[in-house]
Amino acid sequence: MPLLDSFTVDHTRMEAPAVRVAKTMNTPHGDAITVFDLRFCVPNKEVMPERGIHTLEHLFAGFMRNHLNGNGVEIIDISPMGCRTGFYMSLIGTPDEQRVADVWKAAMEDVLKVQDQNQIPELNVYQCGTYQMHSLQEAQDIARSILERDVRINSNEELALPKEKLQELHI
């Protein structure tokens, strides 16, 4: 099985919260696609609570689109990582990491402004697979933590696992 890009970086050295360009590619028509690793938690040390990450999933995508879309950028998708330490954001365009970090912080400010669970988009049995598994309080705790800790940039070069280590891990 081919090695996924996300498994070629050393998770023991990742900082969080931090932005990292996880992958860049071009469509057959030449459009640039960038995938960002938006790391909310330090891998293997922290994890977002399931209700909080689920609520954040509903809020974060819209807020990020409000702040980032335009000027050659359009978000395709923002999805939580299975390990619950962050989100992947796929988009058309090539915004730099600092722009993404600034927008991420603005989106966290927006999360803190949500006053009631009823303001969470698509929070119903028809549009959400587990519509009762939400917590606005947990989502706001996550947002507050991001803003208090600030958002850094993780460098692929600094995090790259050496080929010897990948071989040692039998990958």
Curated annotation (Swiss-Prot):
Its cofactor is Fe cation. Its EC number is 4.4.1.21. The keyword Transmembrane does not apply. One of its GO terms (biological process) is quorum sensing. It catalyses: S-(5-deoxy-D-ribos-5-yl)-L-homocysteine = (S)-4,5-dihydroxypentane-2,3-dione + L-homocysteine. Binds 1 Fe cation per subunit. The keyword Lyase applies. Keywords: Autoinducer synthesis, Iron, Lyase, Metal-binding, Quorum sensing. It holds the Pfam family LuxS. GO terms for molecular function: iron ion binding; S-ribosylhomocysteine lyase activity. Fe cation binds at H54, H58, C128. It is an enzyme of class 4 (lyase). Homodimer. Belongs to the LuxS family. Involved in the synthesis of autoinducer 2 (AI-2) which is secreted by bacteria and is used to communicate both the cell density and the metabolic potential of the environment. The regulation of gene expression in response to changes in cell density is called quorum sensing. Catalyzes the transformation of S-ribosylhomocysteine (RHC) to homocysteine (HC) and 4,5-dihydroxy-2,3-pentadione (DPD). This is S-ribosylhomocysteine lyase.
